């Protein structure tokens, strides 16, 4: 399962202060590859997600899904949920210690779950902070 990256929160206002936190698939945007000021090799495009059924918080004691059809049709996820989680709204995987992402340049990168939160949530997830990211910081 893969979902697009919506940036830190996904539905931030379209003003200059919030634009740096928008991801490629932020809500109500029409971003293109040309919109990515950070460079396509520095920007997350799609990432792995386990979906709601693997999340212990997605069901109540009687097995009823509290979130309904949580991730089906969601389109994009936020980076604000972090990586070290199994919540329905966050990027996650069964791989030991990593989650795989497709960068905007088409490269596939494994991102350590222990990555610095600022690096993941803002610098890799956003498209306009104009900061290069070292692959050493990512893997």
Residue ranges and their predicted role:
Residues 1-139:
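Surface-exposed loop/linker segments characteristic of extracytoplasmic
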């Amino acid at each position: 399962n893969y979902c697009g990256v919506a940036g830190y929160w996904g539905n931030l206002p379209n003003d200059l202060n919030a634009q740096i936190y928008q991801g490629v698939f932020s809500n109500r945007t029409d971003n293109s590859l040309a919109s990515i000021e950070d460079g396509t090799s520095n920007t997350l495009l799609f990432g792995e997600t386990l979906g709601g059924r693997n999340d212990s918080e997605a069901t109540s004691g009687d097995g009823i899904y509290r979130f309904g059809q949580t991730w089906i049709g969601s389109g994009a996820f936020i980076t604000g949920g972090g990586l070290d989680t199994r919540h329905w709204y966050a990027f996650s995987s069964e791989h030991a210690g990593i989650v795989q992402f497709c960068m905007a340049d088409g490269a596939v990168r494994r991102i350590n779950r222990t990555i610095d939160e600022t690096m993941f949530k803002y610098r890799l997830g956003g498209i306009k902070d104009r900061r290069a990211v070292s692959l050493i910081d990512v893997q």
